[in-house]
Amino acid sequence: MRKIPNHGTLRMTKVAYPLGLCVGLFIYVAYIKWHRASAAQAFFTIAGAASGVRWTQQAFSSPDSATRGHEVFYGIMFDAGSTGTRIHVFQFARPPGETPTLTHETFKALKPGLSAYADDVEKSAQGIQELLNVAKQHIPYDFWKATPLVLKATAGLRLLPGEKAQKLLQKVKEVFKASPFLVGDDCVSIMNGTDEGVSAWITVNFLTGSLKTPGSSSVGMLDLGGGSTQITFLPRVEGTLQASPPGHLTALQMFNRTFKLYSYSYLGLGLMSARLAILGGVEGKPAEDDKELVSPCLSPRFRGKWEHAEVTYRISGQKAVGLYELCASRVSEVLRNKVHRTEEAQHVDFYAFSYYYDLAASFGLIDAEKGGSLVVGDFEIAAKYVCRTLETQPPSSPFACMDLTYISLLLHEFGFPGDKVLKLARKIDNVETSWALGAIFHYIDSLKRQKVPAL
């Protein structure tokens, strides 16, 4: 039987419906305003935390599940290295009444590096824009205006003539200014080597939890890039501080604490620059009369071309007895009197990144995906084996003997004995182990000091 409607109820519905619609609309508008305000407030929240609040790091999880009910904010860091440009999009969350946590990182890399566009600046904008699109895809629209956007260039641009480097940076700045993110006048810069090392040290100690508690043991950082190499650690021995040469110590203020770090960057001792020096070439200059560069560190049967910093070199190996010894002798000449050795370094736990990892993984010294630990002597053993079998078992890379020998002797110059254990990792808790995370801390802290409002 069909139910007969109650007309009194119908009259009430006619009144209640528009009233409910208005109330619902009011609540929706209020929510949108609050949501946008929370995005702007995120800038102040993270800046304040970077200056004085202890940060914590939690296990990686999906952005949605990790941030429900928390304040959410983001930071974007471009790493313009010598061999490629990389974007890091960091997501942070602050639970009510607690300190912020890192909840997600998006990472993407493009090759070649910015320095490859030194004579065609307009082309550099294409890759930057492509990476910016990655940030837009992973950051909600409402947070764009409150998200700091920064690019820091490293050794690749430091090695370029000043005018060329500045033109590239200006083009990137133009692209950044046209983006919807939070962009300051200092959003694009060339990072000095010490800052690079310190920022990487912050990253690894943050991710390992060493920065959470005052007095806890920290770890050291070794990074081997294409154009430069860095070593950074926190000395515990007063003699280390007193014996350090000028420019090897830097003070870092973070989390209401002051860290006096031993940190130095050796420009020209990155793996690619070292290759050129070992071959007898000069940075940025073609060989005279297109002369072939011959080295005992290359396979005796190898003859080919190698491009570095936009210059192509003709290179070849040489037939000789005792190739490892000859190669090691040449590498030692390149490193002679260029690296400061500190006694304390051998007693500090170190993480090693970048080409240290890549070479170790390539020759089976660590798991290519998970990383792992090895002793410094493993590089020497691998170098001797590869160099002594160059003629009978040529490796897939013509530079294998050279690179392994260089890394082995570089670590020796730093003062590490053969039985010193190093930890090699690309990621810690799924976060890229680069200087990018540490650098974004520094940048946000500087914004707070300048009292820059979120847009």
Swiss-Prot record:
Modification comment: Might be cleaved at the N-terminus, retained in an intracellular membrane compartment and in addition be released into the extracellular medium. N-glycosylated.
Tissue specificity field: Expressed in heart and brain.
Cofactor note: Strongly and equally activated by either Ca(2+) or Mg(2+).
Signal sequence, start to end: none
Cytoplasmic side: 1-12
GO cellular component, one term: Golgi apparatus
Localization, UniProt: Golgi apparatus membrane; Secreted; Cell membrane
Active-site positions on this chain: E196
Biological process, per Gene Ontology: response to calcium ion; response to magnesium ion
Sorted UniProt keywords: Calcium, Cell membrane, Disulfide bond, Glycoprotein, Golgi apparatus, Hydrolase, Magnesium, Membrane, Secreted, Signal-anchor, Transmembrane, Transmembrane helix
Sugar-bearing residue positions: N192, N256
Membrane topology: Single-pass type II membrane protein
Cited Pfam families: GDA1_CD39 (PF01150)
Family: Belongs to the GDA1/CD39 NTPase family.
Purpose: Catalyzes the hydrolysis of nucleoside triphosphates and diphosphates in a calcium- or magnesium-dependent manner. Has a strong preference for nucleoside diphosphates, preferentially hydrolyzes GDP, IDP, and UDP, with slower hydrolysis of CDP, ITP, GTP, CTP, ADP, and UTP and virtually no hydrolysis of ATP. The membrane bound form might support glycosylation reactions in the Golgi apparatus and, when released from cells, might catalyze the hydrolysis of extracellular nucleotides.
Protein name: Ectonucleoside triphosphate diphosphohydrolase 6
